[in-house]
């Protein structure tokens, strides 16, 4: 597993090279340990995902590319989730999809568009919280049943009431195989 580096800057090519070195180092350790595949996840820049994907494929490993889309339905540079996934498929990703930030319902909304756009395998790994159209990501979610949370933001210490139960997660899993 490799994730966003938090140093990628689309306007600074030196950060692209630094990201490449970071990914190559992590992936070399994974390959030495005998992994079969690498998941690049929680990345919301398409260009950063390209760097991670190249490092995975250059190592001769199966590549899973899961974008994190915190708001709206676009990557940081403005690609729709489905277009970003299609770009990764076209560049050789074996599996594309979405993870993090969004709960099951909001993740599924985007996954359906991804499924229509790509022919490779699709992955969906939502966070287990009840995110909504108004608050699609759990980092900025509010608990409307409680007005005593400092600042009003449930993340990171007051998410308990927003947690999906096992039946909600089972429904997401069932929807994935439809």
Language model segments and positions:
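Domain-level signal for soluble alpha/beta catalytic cores
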Residues: 1-178
